[in-house]
């Protein structure tokens, strides 16, 4: 797994698990709102009245509606070695 995903995956997974509403801002300035239904290496499935597949390369910022507790012990955090993890 890429080092950049060692923060991304636990953060997105906490948003998904806790069904926290999010605002996703795209690089072109468009704001999308909903709940993260699922995600993988390349896309986020955002659910509102419909489900939208949003490509991660088009995302600028993900803003949760409330604070997120994503600080679980994750192998690879604080410079530890990390193996392949599930999303």
Swiss-Prot record:
Domain (Sm) spans 9-68
The answer to keyword RNA-binding applying to this record is yes
Name the Pfam families on file: Hfq
Output the GO biological process annotations, alphabetical, semicolon-separated: regulation of DNA-templated transcription; regulation of RNA stability; regulation of translation, ncRNA-mediated
One GO term in the molecular function aspect is: RNA binding
Q: What InterPro entries does the database record attribute to this sequence?
A: Hfq, LSM_dom_sf, Sm
Q: Which UniProt keywords apply?
A: RNA-binding, Stress response
State any GO CC term: cytosol
Tell me, how does this one assemble?
Homohexamer.
What HAMAP family does the database record attribute to this sequence? Hfq
Instruction: Report the family membership.
Output: Belongs to the Hfq family.
Q: Which PANTHER family match?
A: RNA-BINDING PROTEIN HFQ
Function, as annotated, reads: RNA chaperone that binds small regulatory RNA (sRNAs) and mRNAs to facilitate mRNA translational regulation in response to envelope stress, environmental stress and changes in metabolite concentrations. Also binds with high specificity to tRNAs.
The name this protein goes by in its record: RNA-binding protein Hfq
């Amino acid at each position: 797994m890429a080092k950049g995903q060692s923060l991304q995956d636990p953060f997105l997974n906490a948003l998904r698990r806790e069904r926290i509403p999010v605002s996703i801002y795209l690089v072109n300035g468009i704001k999308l709102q909903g709940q993260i239904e699922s995600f993988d290496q390349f896309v986020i499935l955002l659910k509102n009245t419909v489900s939208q597949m949003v490509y991660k390369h088009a995302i600028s910022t993900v803003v949760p509606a409330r604070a997120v507790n994503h600080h679980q012990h994750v192998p690879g955090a604080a410079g530890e070695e990390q193996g392949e993890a599930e999303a």
